[in-house]
């Protein structure tokens, strides 16, 4: 986080207490990895006992329990920030973190959140790039592997493999999926001996 600074634990307005919508989304995504946090922000109602009396606690997130896939996270309000809402939604194999800041009313806060979530659901799709990359790599091997010369080595005894993607599944705009292109850049000459895991090229998407 580079544009976030916390001065107090309560979050009331202060010149030195600030963040951005993007970094609030990053922080929320990290916080959801904590099972206790995830359980609390995903709970619609809870009853506690105070001095022998029952006290009902109601989550102020209007979307929780009223929109498919919503599982958190937090409403907020100060005079400086106005109405805020960070929402977590899981649908269509996507985990969406939506941040709305500075809304004039609760209604606008909720409606803007719904619009943003629906925009993502209608325009993006999770694509497994690893499968596409593997297919492209196999095609490249069949066409070009034998053109790579390793001087002083046994001809055609070169074995190559593809490093797995760290994040193989990513959201991509639906109208861009069919236009994805791949380009393989590689060296075609080496001197033996070659170390295991020598990089001979790269595949760009």
Predicted regions mapped to residue ranges:
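Short, charged, amphipathic alpha-helices and their helix-cap/turn boundaries
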Residues: 1-2
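Short, conserved loop-to-beta-strand elements that form functional interface hotspots
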Residues: 9
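Domain-terminus/edge residues, biased toward the C-terminal soluble/receptor-binding domains
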Residues: 13-205
């Amino acid at each position: 986080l580079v544009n976030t600074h916390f001065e107090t634990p309560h979050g009331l307005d202060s010149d030195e207490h600030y963040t951005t919508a993007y970094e609030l989304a990053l922080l929320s995504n990290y916080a959801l990895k904590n099972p206790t946090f995830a359980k609390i922000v995903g709970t619609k109602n809870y009853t506690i006992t105070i001095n022998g009396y029952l006290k009902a606690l109601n989550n102020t997130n209007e979307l929780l329990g009223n929109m498919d896939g919503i599982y958190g996270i937090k409403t907020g309000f100060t005079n400086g920030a106005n109405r805020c809402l960070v929402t977590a939604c899981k649908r269509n194999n996507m985990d969406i973190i939506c941040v709305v800041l500075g809304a004039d009313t609760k209604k606008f806060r909720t409606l803007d959140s719904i619009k943003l979530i629906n925009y993502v659901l209608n325009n993006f799709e999770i694509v497994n790039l690893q499968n596409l990359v593997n297919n492209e790599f196999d095609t490249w091997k069949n066409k070009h592997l034998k053109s790579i010369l390793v001087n002083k080595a046994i001809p055609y005894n070169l074995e190559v493999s593809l490093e797995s993607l760290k994040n193989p599944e990513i959201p991509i705009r639906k109208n861009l999926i069919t236009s994805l292109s791949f380009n393989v850049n590689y060296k075609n000459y080496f001197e033996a001996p070659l170390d295991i895991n020598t990089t001979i090229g790269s595949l760009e998407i």
